[in-house]
């Protein structure tokens, strides 16, 4: 049995890398581990809002992290302090066979019941993705196969993916549904090789009615895993079984992804999700407040929504922080209280607020050009390289989709943005002057204002 403190430190490091500073301070730093047994990890959180968020967004990552660290399959149990009860002595059970521990591909795959279409707030940034996901859920395997949903962190890709699974299961309880992250798939494949059970692995993955694979971009540097997934994909596609994939970028932008996989991922429909606009952010907060029975004025919701522009996770994290601050001070939630609660997050400094026009202005000023030069069609070197740098910075420092970046930088095609990003990345490895310019511009943009 692994040391609980060491395991928790490992999970903390993973969350610190994957979450924004706002998310990490709100959800992870306020939680603490209570007990670890062979099949259960108890985690204490301060309030019911934290519990709901953990159960909706973080338990799957805990399961993956514990398996990576200790090769244990556990069910995370999230409890508030009031709910926490001493675990009965009968929780201690004999260790399972080593072979059984390795058969991760035989473990049940749990869809989060809270990820439904009813709980999804539709806005301009996700309405096409929502419509496509709903169409797939209502008639799996017949249209948009595969469905490829891409966009930044915390924008609802996993929610939509699991909503498809939950609706399919609701319509057909006998449906065989498999939800995994790309890391799960890779680990299962490796374990099947080590235990000489590749045939069982293939039976598990190639006989499903619906395969949901999250964060497919992590396949990029795994050649053998890509080979296995290629054959899995082909089998399911030929049998008209539905495949849904998510990624933080388009298929042809994933580094080291085989061309034949890119081609297959592009067979269906690719839809993006972008950061929610103000109206959608307010609706998300109202939906969350109503679900948690929180009394909060509309003007306060508007204030919070105006402070958090990055993603839904940070938005919900801000609401939880305000609710906790209200409880601690024993005061009603007001705009003034919300401002005090969010002050420590230094929201005015976060890079998530950076816009493409700000990048264009900074790049134009730096290279003594005009914004119109960058948006124009002139192909002289003195303009082309700054234009490519602007596209590179927009891709690296904002959550905007490739089509959005291209549109705002002179109506360019998304493939032009991909080329510019790759060109600047490659050039920085050999051109020290260019690298210094990009670093200096990054610092200017980070320290703007």
Swiss-Prot record:
SUPFAM superfamilies: P-loop containing nucleoside triphosphate hydrolases, TrpR-like. Residues 1-72 are annotated as: Domain I, interacts with DnaA modulators. Residues 72-109 are annotated as: Domain II. Its main location: cytoplasm. It is found in: Cytoplasm. GO terms for cellular component: cytoplasm; plasma membrane. Domain I is involved in oligomerization and binding regulators, domain II is flexibile and of varying length in different bacteria, domain III forms the AAA+ region, while domain IV binds dsDNA. Plays an essential role in the initiation and regulation of chromosomal replication. ATP-DnaA binds to the origin of replication (oriC) to initiate formation of the DNA replication initiation complex once per cell cycle. Binds the DnaA box (a 9 base pair repeat at the origin) and separates the double-stranded (ds)DNA. Forms a right-handed helical filament on oriC DNA; dsDNA binds to the exterior of the filament while single-stranded (ss)DNA is stabiized in the filament's interior. This is Chromosomal replication initiator protein DnaA.
């Amino acid at each position: 049995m692994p040391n609980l403190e060491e395991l928790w430190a490992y999970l903390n490091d993973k969350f610190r890398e994957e979450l924004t500073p706002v998310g990490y301070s709100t959800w992870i730093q306020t939680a603490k581990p209570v007990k670890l047994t062979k099949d259960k990890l108890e985690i204490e959180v301060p309030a019911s809002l934290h519990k709901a968020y953990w159960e909706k967004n973080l338990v799957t990552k805990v399961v993956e992290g514990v398996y990576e660290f200790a090769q244990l399959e556990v069910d995370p149990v999230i409890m508030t302090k009031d709910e926490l009860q001493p675990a009965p002595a009968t929780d201690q059970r004999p260790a399972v066979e080593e072979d059984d521990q390795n058969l991760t591909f035989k473990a049940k795959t749990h869809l989060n019941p809270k990820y439904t279409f009813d709980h999804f707030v539709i806005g301009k940034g996700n309405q096409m993705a929502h419509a496509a996901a709903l169409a797939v859920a209502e008639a799996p395997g017949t249209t948009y196969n595969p469905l490829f949903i891409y966009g930044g962190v915390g924008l609802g890709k996993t929610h939509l993916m699991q909503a498809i699974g939950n609706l399919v299961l609701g319509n057909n309880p006998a449906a065989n549904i498999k939800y995994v992250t790309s890391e799960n798939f890779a680990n299962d494949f490796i374990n099947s090789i080590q235990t000489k059970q590749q045939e069982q692995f293939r039976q598990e993955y190639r006989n499903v009615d619906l395969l949901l694979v999250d964060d497919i971009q992590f396949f990029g540097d795994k050649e053998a895993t890509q080979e296995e997934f290629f054959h899995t994909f082909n089998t399911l596609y030929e049998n008209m079984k539905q495949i849904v994939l998510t990624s933080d970028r388009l298929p042809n932008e994933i580094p080291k992804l085989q061309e034949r996989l890119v081609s297959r991922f592009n067979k269906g429909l690719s839809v993006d999700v972008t950061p929610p606009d103000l109206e959608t952010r307010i609706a998300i907060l109202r939906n969350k407040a109503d679900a948690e029975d929180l009394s909060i004025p509309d003007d306060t919701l508007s204030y919070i929504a105006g402070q958090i522009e990055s993603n839904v996770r940070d938005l919900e994290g801000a609401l939880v922080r305000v609710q906790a601050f209200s409880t601690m001070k024993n005061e009603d939630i007001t705009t003034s209280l919300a401002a005090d609660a969010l002050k420590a997050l230094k929201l005015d400094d976060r890079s998530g607020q950076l816009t493409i026009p700000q990048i264009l202005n900074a790049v134009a000023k730096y290279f003594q050009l005009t914004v119109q030069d960058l948006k124009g069609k002139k192909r002289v070197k003195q303009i082309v390289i700054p234009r490519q740098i602007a596209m590179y910075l927009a891709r690296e420092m904002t959550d905007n989709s490739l089509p959005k970046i291209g549109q705002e930088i002179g109506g360019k095609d998304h493939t032009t943005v991909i080329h510019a990003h790759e060109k600047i990345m490659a050039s920085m490895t050999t051109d020290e002057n260019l690298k210094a310019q990009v670093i200096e511009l990054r610092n200017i943009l980070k320290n703007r204002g």
